[in-house]
Amino acid sequence: MRKDMTIGNPMKIILLFSLPVLLGNLFQQFYNMVDTVIVGQYLGEDALAAVGSTGCLMFLVLGFANGIAQGFGVMVSHAFGAKDMKLLRHYVALSLLLTVVISMILTVPTVAFSRQLLLWLNTPENIITLANRYIRVIFAGIFATMAYNVASGILRGIGDSRTPLYFLILSSGLNIFLDIFLIVVVKLGTAGAAYATVISQAVSAVLCFIVMFRKHDILRTTREDYYCDFHEIRRMLSVGIPMALNYSITAIGTMILQSAVNVFGSSVVAAFTAASKVSNIATQTMPTLGTAMATYCGQNLGAGKHDRIFRGMKDAFYLCFFAAGAAALLCCLAGPTMVGCFIHNPSEQTLHAAMQYLHIASIFMLPLAWIFVYRNGLQGLDRGLVPMLSGVLELFSRYAVILIAAKPFGYVGVCSADVAAWLTTGILLIVTYMIWKQRVKKQLNAENATMNCIK
């Protein structure tokens, strides 16, 4: 069901759109959690550390691909808000063509140099082979991952957040089955977990595209929609590439953090991996709000309804407090139990290290919520430069804290790097939005004054 977000109560629309996205994000985390749980329970702590050590590298590459996919969805939301269905179908056609090209460009070098990338991350010698077996398969499946995100981005661009959810639920069951079969029965080790994820993503992508074209006639492309239009390609990439670079820049900061954690040994790596998984699950309301605001702002910008943008962003600001509070409580109260889901009988040292990160992160969840809401909102408003630069600020904030705090404070100092990145970036994005808002209000007031003079 497509949803016009340019009419109706903004808070209600944002929440109704967000619920399926939240469930979808949780199932996306469920993919990763099932991989991690089964790897940790059946293959041991070293295998878990190996899979965990690839997380930031996956985020770097897949985040770039998925950022571009989200950018395509933003352009679809602009066309849908403007009620320009011919342009909308052209954006869909270009999205499909660019997905093929970009995924090929990303797949070849990452598969070829996966081991070298792990070496640059200071991956411990005892887990690097296991990590490489996992990440090579993930990189080989970039097309499947990007295709699903393009399909879901297009659907969300027209306000349909339910269809992507249905197929994620279906494919999550397949992922569980394949995890158990490929790891426990076939005994493919860490590679089996990667195969399960890629196959599940591929199934989800295929089904999503089939239903997308059958269910929504406005998305059904014809031969006339597939033509080379460099102007529109540039427009799509001008939105998609900053979003992609933002993911990648953030990922580089995470890689620096992961590299700093790796020097403390495989036990601490396993603890950090489990804690990061717990934090990701606890904070899923935040990227959910971000996705909703990108679509909401994109549609209303296309429709020229700036007052609705102001009201929606104000409502989202208040929702950030709820999201941050819920995430902090979950990390602090359920953290030990959730860490135990990822590591079978964790040692006291491992559990302590995991909870150290969660306690530090919980204090500063609110700035993290601001990042998702205001970064995605600004990107939906076709203001991609500052969100991209905010990623650079995240990178330097993490790096600076690691340089300053890692030696005197050890692992605790490294954990504080995320907090510094969230705080500085969240403030920058809020200030940027407020400046944009004041400029738009001033422009609208000037236009109204001119119209009154004419009358």
What kind of feature is each model-predicted range?
Residues 1-18, 76-141, 185-241, 297-364, ...:
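Short alpha-helical transmembrane segments in multi-pass integral membrane proteins
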Residues 7, 11-30, 34, 57, ...:
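Residue-level signal for short hydrophobic patches within transmembrane helices
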Residues 16-35, 137, 148, 171, ...:
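Transmembrane helical elements of multi-pass membrane transporters/channels
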Residues 26, 30-48, 118-125, 181-188, ...:
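Helix-terminus/linker motif at the lipid-water interface of multi-pass membrane proteins
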Residues 39-59, 125-130, 190-191, 232-239, ...:
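Interfacial/gating helices of multi-pass transporter permease domains
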Residues 48-108, 145-164, 271-335, 368-390:
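Small-residue-rich hydrophobic transmembrane alpha-helices
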Residues 60, 175-179, 205-209, 281-284, ...:
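Hydrophobic transmembrane alpha-helices of multi-pass small-molecule transporters
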Residues 69, 137-156, 164-172, 193-206, ...:
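Short runs within selected transmembrane alpha-helices of multi-pass transporters and secretion channels
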